[in-house]
From Swiss-Prot:
It comes from the Eukaryota. The gene is EPO. Residues 1-27 form the signal peptide. Keywords: Disulfide bond, Erythrocyte maturation, Glycoprotein, Hormone, Secreted, Signal. One of its GO terms (cellular component) is extracellular space. InterPro entries: 4_helix_cytokine-like_core (IPR009079), EPO/TPO_CS (IPR019767), EPO_TPO (IPR001323), Erythroptn (IPR003013). It comes from Macaca mulatta (Rhesus macaque). This is Erythropoietin. Hormone involved in the regulation of erythrocyte proliferation and differentiation and the maintenance of a physiological level of circulating erythrocyte mass. Binds to EPOR leading to EPOR dimerization and JAK2 activation thereby activating specific downstream effectors, including STAT1 and STAT3.
Length: 192
C-alpha cells in the first residue's frame, strides 16, 4: 500500500496528531483542515464536559465571575458580515475563551476538593483550544486581525460565567455557533 493509497481515516488521524503541533501532514489532501470531522471532535468533547458539569453543584462553582464571549448569533446579520470581519470576531472570541478556560483551570488547581472528572475536561478543553487556534491560523484568521478594517470592528460582546457548567456551555456554544459558521464559510470560499 503506497503513501497515496492510505484511507481517509488515516489522514484524519495524522492531521489530528499534527494539528496541535502546527505541522503539515505530508501527502495529505490540502483541504483536510476544512474536514468537518476535525471540528466535530472538539464539539463532542465540549458537549461532554458540559454534560459532566450539569450534575455537580458546589464543586463546580468558579467562586468568581470569569468574562467569556457572548455566543449569541444573529444568523441573518452574521451572513452579511464580510469573512474578514467574521474572522476578527471569532479570533477575539477564541482568545477570550482561552483565557477564561485557563483561569478556570487555575481556580480548579487552587480548589481544596477538586472534582476529578472536571480536571480531565479542563485539560481536554485547553488542548482543544490550542488545536482550534492552529486551525484558525491555517484559515488565515490571525491575518484578519492586522487588516485596517479590524480596528473599526465592533467591540466583542461578553458575558460572565460563575460555574464550570456555564463555562463549558459557552465553550460548546462558541464552537457550534460562530466558529463553525466562520470555518464553513472560509473553507467554502477557499480563504486559507
Amino acid at each position: 500500500m503506497g503513501v497515496h493509497e492510505c484511507p481517509a481515516w488515516l489522514w484524519l488521524l495524522l492531521s489530528l496528531v499534527s494539528l496541535p503541533l502546527g505541522l503539515p501532514v505530508p501527502g495529505a489532501p490540502p483541504r483536510l483542515v476544512c474536514d468537518s470531522r476535525v471540528l466535530e471532535r472538539y464539539l463532542l468533547e465540549a458537549k461532554e464536559a458540559e454534560n459532566v458539569t450539569m450534575g455537580c453543584s458546589e464543586s463546580c462553582s468558579l467562586n468568581e465571575n470569569i468574562t467569556v464571549p457572548d455566543t449569541k448569533v444573529n444568523f441573518y446579520a452574521w451572513k452579511r458580515i464580510e469573512v474578514g470581519q467574521q474572522a476578527v470576531e471569532v479570533w477575539q472570541g477564541l482568545a477570550l475563551l482561552s483565557e477564561a478556560v485557563l483561569r478556570g483551570q487555575a481556580v480548579l488547581a487552587n480548589s481544596s476538593q477538586p472534582f476529578e472528572p472536571l480536571q480531565l475536561h479542563m485539560d481536554k478543553a485547553i488542548s482543544g483550544l490550542r488545536s482550534i487556534t492552529t486551525l484558525l491560523r491555517a484559515l488565515g484568521a490571525q491575518e484578519a486581525i492586522s487588516l485596517p478594517d479590524a480596528a473599526s470592528a465592533a467591540p466583542l460582546r461578553t458575558i460572565t460565567a460563575d460555574t464550570f457548567c456555564k463555562l463549558f456551555r459557552v465553550y460548546s456554544n462558541f464552537l457550534r455557533g460562530k466558529l463553525k459558521l466562520y470555518t464553513g464559510e472560509a473553507c467554502r470560499r477557499g480563504d486559507r
